[in-house]
UniProtKB/Swiss-Prot annotation:
Residues 80-174 form the CRIC domain. The keyword Phosphoprotein applies. The lineage of its organism: Eukaryota, Metazoa, Chordata, Craniata, Vertebrata. Residues 663-676, 889-899 have a biased composition (Polar residues). Residues 761-770 have a biased composition (Basic and acidic residues). This is CNK3/IPCEF1 fusion protein. Residues 634-662, 735-745 have a biased composition (Low complexity). Residues 211-293 form the PDZ domain. Residues 7-72 form the SAM domain.
């Protein structure tokens, strides 16, 4: 690879063409100035200002990409684990020595001052930058598979977070320094222990570059690579698909970084530009990959452990169309970027995955019945992929909704902190957020935060679309259109309240085992558990508005949990997903639950073979800081009922998935294509889908009732509450009246007839509840519309204003109107401010030429806007019109001439 310092101006221009879309307006300026590679690596804020890149955010985007080039050019042959640990140790020693020497000074004011000196803050930033450089290595293979390195990484992350929190506290500097010294001493101990106790040669090995040729790519086959891009433009391969061109090369492994594609450096590029470059030559691709050392503890990187799927066939189906996420805030270019990448992540899994077995080699009760004959082989490892059985029992399996980008990989054990990945930044450290934990499993959207908005904000790890089976096993996804036959809508199953579930097949208080119980706290928590059909919900109490967890029982197994020390415990497990442990108060209750759950599993297997397999939980939500103690057993009324499951599925009251927890919707591999085809719907689409389901004879439990004129407005609010912004409901009501006029003009009651007898009882109860709560609905509608009970407009709170910019409508046309209104309001405020400044100048009785010249220098942009408006406006026909122009527009340039 040619060094970046040897780049010609043409190579620099070619590299800038792949950067963020908002930077393309400056490409011609780089071309005009003929900047070479050496000048590019030394570019600064001042240089960018002279080039015409005036916006700070745009400058930061360019400098972030240049930082990656500097790391590639200067640190490739020198950086290794040992050097990075030594750099972290040196930074911590420097900070410790600075604090000690400062305290010895006679002018020390740490006990009286609350403002830390700049040198102190700079040393802290340098320490965190050195820690990030080390964590970027620990976050990838081969270090993610080694327990010692994983523990070290988690400790460093926690210490850096403590360090960041400490320097931001409002306290005396001496107290701040004491806490920083405590953190620094622990960091020094970790660094010393890592250097002394680790003798693995991988500590001294540097990364290397390797060129990979992928020839003879068949049309429609794709490359079979899984690529994850960081926010600043680093592209990491997270795995390959079996029997794909990338897999057949035997040179592409998880953790490799894509440096060049067809001799073009793509470091710092947008992912969609990388995909375009990969598709540039349909016959073959030449990749230059940066590989980490691979010699730790006999560790050799494998393409992935997703070999459970059969060799894929060449795809002939067209790429699916993605739908717009209702809560997404990304711009149009980023949405197009999703659909442009879908062809890279192929092929889809087969319809029938392997079936795991228990220790005796037999199929477990309640498991999948698609494979009946056991395979020959030794006991406990009868399938060629039996090693996955043990791994998957302690792993979680997540899958994103249909509008998320499929085919990304993640790992397990997420830390409940807001972090994101960052590559080692050489040169001046930048105050970025912490890199993500390497052994975690979550849902994070790499496109959820547009890069044009800067890089200082934290990005939640709950917003990336990933899918994995274990630490490195990936399953490619492909959306397939499928007609909806279920009688319920696609949304988070946990959004249904305990009261709305109606009659249940079995319900009562059960203990549920926490996934991560601390050493001293109780490992079991009491929940109100409801079994309805094939769905199992658990709530914190009987009046909860949202379930803490949800499991769709098909393909799960129900059996006694003999491995638990808790009495009367049983488990609901799936070898490819996870295991839930529950415990009853006595043997009778446990037997009732086992019978009911087993019947639900068997009944659903025989009736709905293509049913999706879900698991949602809020057990690990970061918002739940403290657990509420369960009510005393004496006050808990045990209401275990034994009723047959109705043929209808649980009624859901929304149309969009909720990804508010770290554990989200999960599905069995056999239902991936069908489950991903569910798209978000507007209200007309929802009514159409319900009508279609009604024609097919499917039970439907979703109804919208319209009563008197005032309650009808509340009903419309209730039906469309997920589609509109709360603080702007007054404006949205006028918009929604047009959208729903065709429905309301033809139907006074939006109901679904011909319901089965099993759901009539539930409907009667729901109708009774709706009649009883009519005033409550009306009050909530007034509250959502920011109106008082008397109809007066009440000011919006800060929380509502914040929500108005977070929530998004599902209707794109209304979204555009809302955005236009916000834009016009902002423009109006800006113009009013400019007008006030001009009026202040004109109303000054002591205005002189000197004051005006000073004002003109301070308001150069305003003067330029006035000149531009004057050029755009038609010239007056007569000189007599000048006084009228002055009266009409005091901001006209004629004011300047008169002065």
């Amino acid at each position: 690879m040619e060094p970046v310092t040897k780049w010609s101006p043409k190579q620099v221009v070619d590299w800038t063409r792949g950067l963020d879309d908002c930077l393309q307006q400056y490409v011609h300026k780089f071309e005009r100035e003929k900047i070479n590679g050496e000048q590019l690596l030394q570019i600064s804020h001042q240089d960018l200002e002279e080039l015409g890149v005036t916006r700070i955010g745009h400058q930061e985007l360019v400098l972030e990409a240049v930082d990656l080039l500097c790391a590639l050019n200067y640190g490739l042959e020198t950086d290794n684990m040992k050097n990075l640990v030594l750099k972290l140790r040196a930074s911590s020693h420097n900070l410790q020595n600075y604090i000690s020497s400062r305290r010895k000074s006679p002018a020390y004011d740490g006990n009286t001052s609350r403002k830390a000196p700049n040198e102190f803050l700079t040393s802290v930033v340098e320490l965190i930058g050195a820690a990030k450089a080390l964590l970027a290595w620990l976050d990838r293979a081969p270090f993610t598979g080694i327990t010692d390195f994983s523990v070290t990484k988690n400790k460093i992350i926690q210490l850096c977070l403590d360090l960041t929190t400490t320097v931001q506290k409002d306290c005396f500097v001496a107290e701040m320094e004491d806490k920083v010294l405590t953190v620094v001493k622990v960091l020094n101990g970790i660094c010393d222990k890592t250097i002394r106790s680790t003798t693995d040669p991988v500590m001294s090995q540097c990364a290397c570059l390797e060129e990979v040729h992928l020839p003879n790519i068949k049309p429609g086959e794709g490359l079979g690579m899984y690529i994850k891009s960081t926010y600043d433009g680093l592209h990491v391969i997270t795995g390959t698909t079996e029997n794909s061109p990338a897999d057949r090369s035997q040179k592409i492994h998880a953790g490799d970084e894509v440096i060049q594609v067809n001799q073009q450096t793509v470091v710092g590029w947008q992912l969609k530009n990388l995909v375009k470059k990969l598709r540039e030559n349909p016959t073959g691709v030449v990749l230059l990959l940066k590989k980490r050392p691979t010699g730790s503890f006999n560790f050799t990187p494998a393409p992935l452990k997703n070999l459970r799927w059969k060799p894929p066939l060449v795809q002939t189906s067209p790429p699916p169309a993605t739908t717009q996420s209702p809560e997404s805030t990304m711009d149009t270019s980023l949405k197009k970027e999703k659909s442009a990448i879908l062809d890279l992540y192929i092929p889809p899994p087969p319809a029938v995955p392997y079936s795991p077995r228990d220790e005796n080699g037999s199929f477990v009760y309640g498991g999948s019945s698609k494979c009946k004959q056991p395979l020959p082989g030794p006991k406990g490892s009868e399938s060629p992929n039996s090693f996955l059985d043990q791994e998957s029992r302690r792993r979680r399996f997540t899958i994103a909704d249909s509008d998320q980008l499929p085919g990304y990989s993640v790992e397990t054990n997420i830390l409940p902190t807001k972090m994101r990945e960052k590559t080692p930044s050489y040169g001046k450290p930048r105050p970025l957020s912490m890199p993500a934990d390497g052994n975690w499993m979550g849902i994070v959207d790499p496109f959820a935060r547009p890069r044009g908005h800067g890089r200082k904000a934290f990005v939640s790890t709950k917003m990336t679309s990933y899918m994995a089976i274990d630490g490195s096993a990936l399953v490619p996804l492909r959306q397939k259109p499928r007609r909806k036959t279920q009688g319920f809508l696609t949304m988070s199953r946990r959004r249904i309240s305990c009261k709305d579930l109606g009659h249940a097949d079995c319900q009562g208080w059960l203990y549920k085992k926490k996934e991560k119980g601390s050493f001293l706290s109780n490992k079991w928590k009491k929940f109100w558990v409801i079994l309805k059909g094939s769905s199992l919900y658990w709530y914190s109490n009987q009046m909860a508005e949202k379930a803490d967890g949800f499991v769709n029982l098909p393909d799960f197994t129900v059996e006694r949990a003999s491995e638990c020390k808790k009495k009367h415990a049983f488990k609901i497990s799936h070898p490819q997903i996870k295991t839930f442990y529950f415990a009853a108060e006595n043997v009778q209750e446990m037997n009732v639950w086992l019978n009911k759950l087993g019947s639900a599993v068997i009944h659903q297997e025989s009736t709905t073979k293509d049913e999706e397999c879900y698991s949602e939980s809020e057990q690990e939500d970061p918002e739940i800081a403290a657990e509420t103690p369960p009510p005393p057993h004496a006050s808990q009324t045990q209401s275990l009922t034994a009723q047959q499951a109705s043929s209808s599925s649980p009624s859901l009251s929304g149309t969009s998935y909720s990804f508010s927890s770290l554990e989200n919707t999960v599905k069995t591999p056999s239902s991936f294509p069908s489950s991903l085809s569910k798209e978000r719907q507007s209200l007309p689409d929802t009514v159409n889908s319900l009508s279609a389901a009604e024609d097919e004879g499917q039970p439907i439990t979703f109804a919208v009732q319209v009563h008197s004129p005032v309650p009808s407005e509340a009903g419309i609010h209730k039906a469309l509450e997920n589609s509109f912004v709360t603080s702007e409901s007054g404006f949205l009501n006028s918009l929604s009246s047009d959208d729903t006029s065709s429905l309301s003009s033809n139907h006074d009651h939006l109901t679904v007839p011909d319901k089965p007898a099993g759901s009539k009882i539930m409907d009667k109860e729901e109708t009774k509840v709706s009649e009883d709560d009519e005033m409550e609905k009306l009050y909530k509608s007034l509250e959502q519309a920011s109106l008082s009970p008397l109809g007066d407009r009440r000011p919006s709170t800060k929380k509502e204003l914040r929500k108005s910019f977070v929530k998004r409508c599902k209707n794109p046309s209304i979204n555009e109107k809302l955005h236009k209104i916000r834009t016009l309001n902002s423009t109006l405020k800006c113009k009013e401010h400019d007008l006030a400044m001009i009026n202040q100048l004109l109303d000054d009785p002591k205005l002189t030429a000197r004051k005006y010249r000073e004002w003109k220098v301070m308001n150069t942009l305003l003067i330029q806007d006035i000149y531009q408006q004057q050029r755009a406006s038609p010239a007056p026909d007569d000189t007599d019109d000048t006084p009228q122009e002055l009266k009409k527009s005091p901001s006209s340039p004629s004011v300047e001439n008169s002065i």
